[in-house]
Amino acid sequence: MNPSRSTALAAAAVLTVVASAAACGSNEPTKPKNAPGKPGGAYSVALTEPDHLLPGRTTSSYSLQVLQGLFDPPAALDPKNGSVKPLAAVSWSTTDNIVWTLKFRSGTTFHNGEKVTAASFADAWNAAAYGPNAWDANYYFAQIKGYDALNPSEEDAKPSARTLSGLKVLDETTLQVTLKAPFGQFPMLLSFPAFAPLPKAATANPDAADVAPIGNGPYRIDGAWERNQKIRLAKFTGYRGPRKPMADRVDFKIYTSRETAFTELQAGNVDVLTTVPAANSAQAKRLFGERFSIRPSGTMDYLGLPVKDPRFADSRLRKALSMAIDRKGITQAIYNGVYKPATSLVGDMIPGHRTDACGQTCAYDPVAAKQLFEAAGGFDGPLELHFSNADTTYEQWMTSIANQLKDNLGIQEVKFRKMAPADLSALLNEGKNKGPFRQNWVIDYPSIQNYLDGLYYPGNRSGWSDKEFDALVAKGNAAQGAEAIASYQKAEDMALRELPYIPLWNWQDQSAWSDRIDNVIIDPYAAGLHLDRVTVSD
């Protein structure tokens, strides 16, 4: 859900065998018009310090950018349209969306020379899914049969198993996966780096592999991870997968802020910045011309509401809050008009996105908002707004929202609760917040389901739940293609009627790069820059 994809597959009558998936949009990846250069050379990428480099231990977008070069998970997403295609796998098949058979490439090795087998994937997944390991990507494996035995719900209870019962190694290159329930999006899920394989050395000593990862991707780590300074990758000459690396070396330079990284890019001290600050968009466009891009993003910001608090229990009040917010004015003032005001629960690059799913609920209408607010009985007590200090713009737009709620609804007392990201996350997860909060969602794969499951999971931060909503999501999970999307859209409609999360705006990502490099492909669906495709011109 952090940092990082229509349904993955076309509907099939009996058997789904995947070698490629249906196109699902017209979003083109970012790349320059000049022709690719020759293989060789080195280039640098600006990055914020990752938290981990072991795939199952991280969901951070900063880590995932590095892992994109180090590991090949079973599947990948096409940067042109988000469709799913094999990567470390060569095919997958199912007859019921429950039992899946994965066939992997033969003749591939890890960076230490160990052969990559079906067991390498099973071992990695079991390690990530085992609750006591406390790996960050644990929940990505919750769809697989046996997950609950590895993650008992009772406090202090011990797991009754060490491995997922739904995994069965059939032979050296074949893995059978049994899910707990039908899930047609499963191949798309397999593109997430946590599903990459691990060698025996990594499962035996994950702490060592976390700082010196041993992957199966086109690049290997070169030297030590210099914390808060740099990470160097070198071409893996033994790579036998489908991604042929062009540059010999990739240097990740670590910066503490995007603003500093942008200054370094202007000075020629780094070659690629995939997160140009919104405030610098006009300057970046002027300086870099065709080497600057604004591309679609699946990332959304919401205002979450604690619906179990009696003050927020009435959906009319929640709609009044939404209609009192001037999304266009805020995005113009704070994000230079780069971010798009939300008209849906999901990003506009997502297959099945509807341009006006939210309707009048997301339209700025202070008069109608005040009428709804009064009909709902108004609001008692101070309104506390919760957000993190991770980005200065969060406080800026929360201040704008506070002023608009004061002016348009007459809520006079508003208090800010700004705190460190980890503290805010803990507060929200424990349900101890006393008011609305910033909720962000970064897609893992381009499906409406990813938003629905990510925002409205059992025990979610808003406290909202509905059995009919759950049934609609489950119906979509059991289907594929247009049938799945139709069920997910009905679930989205219900969530927008109840509005435990108020959609605010859809991010748009900005990137720029130096004239030293060509063939820059920045993926709106996955982990940013395609490291293997970049060529160096000098």
Question: Whereabouts are the PLM-identified features?
Answer:
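Detector for C-terminal structural segments
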Residues: 15, 325-352, 393-403, 425-538
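N-terminal lobe/hinge region of extracytoplasmic solute-binding protein
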Residues: 46-96, 214, 503
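Aromatic- and charge-enriched surface segment that lines or borders ligand/interaction sites
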Residues: 90-141, 176, 311
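Alpha-helical secondary-structure segments
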Residues: 116-126, 172-178, 218, 247-249, ...
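Surface-exposed binding/hinge segments that line
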Residues: 129, 133-199
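Gly/Pro-rich hinge or "lid" segments in bacterial periplasmic/extracellular proteins
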Residues: 158, 173, 179-245, 249
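Ligand-site clamp/hinge motif
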Residues: 204-207, 213, 238-283
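Structural transition elements
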Residues: 340-375, 389-396
